[in-house]
Amino acid sequence: MSLTSRLYKLRLSSLHSFGSLPILPPPLRSSRIAAPLSLRVSLSTRSIATSIAMGEAADAGMDAVQRRLMFDDECILVDEVDRVVGHESKYNCHMWEKIESGNMLHRAFSVFLFNSKFELLLQQRSATKVTFPLVWTNTCCSHPLYRESELIDENNLGVRNAAQRKLLDELGIPAEDVPVDEFTPLSRMLYKAPSDGKWGEHELDYLLFIVRDVAVHPNPDEVAEIKYVNREQLKELLKKADAGEEGLKLSPWFRLVVDNFLPKWWDHVEKGTLSEAVDMKSIHKL
């Protein structure tokens, strides 16, 4: 049994009191029709050199799947008013030294998926994640990539496309179950948070809400555990995290949303009035 499997099985028993859902093997993924590319993105000399030196630069203990994503994925660099200024590898975007020295900021998104009972789907990040392993967070948190389909600004379509892609990658939710026009982008926030001495986040984060009943089949390379929570169960989870019980931790971006926005937005979810909460003109610096 691999180290990843042992860590994964060990963590599955940590929070059963919250009604955790079992992890099932991910389904076979259907082929995805890519949008025709009119935008041609060439690798910079820096990116090529990084790829060549990947084996030397990467931590020896980094999981192979996470290593591939760290070097292959190109994040979208933006300024503090969300204008695209370039692109960089996921690896470099999450190195705390580069974040601090170059103020490197990239675009991200956080999905909050509710079922028809208005329960919020949470995930615990896998033990092999490079940043914030084994922390509990909202449904899905990731980055649009520097590709034509995820750079579309109109109606925030690029970010919606990225959210749909990652819900399949991480949670096995097919694209047809989460249509892009069902996502409601509510606002944006800008935050910075260290993960450990080497890694961290500096993101301009799009906050996307969606209400759908979906079948979830988590990918164990990305997700250790999932659970649906109502408001009271989330409060209990927060209390345990604040008290440090059972080693429970929450992601910093999720906690920022919980503390600043989630209660009032949850009200709108229950009332069916999410459109009234939309404020995409603001970028909240937290």
From Swiss-Prot:
It catalyses: isopentenyl diphosphate = dimethylallyl diphosphate. The keyword Isomerase applies. Pfam families: NUDIX. PROSITE patterns: NUDIX. Residues 104-256 form the Nudix hydrolase domain. PANTHER family: ISOPENTENYL-DIPHOSPHATE DELTA-ISOMERASE. Catalyzes the 1,3-allylic rearrangement of the homoallylic substrate isopentenyl (IPP) to its highly electrophilic allylic isomer, dimethylallyl diphosphate (DMAPP). This is Isopentenyl-diphosphate Delta-isomerase II. The lineage of its organism: Eukaryota, Viridiplantae, Streptophyta, Embryophyta, Tracheophyta.
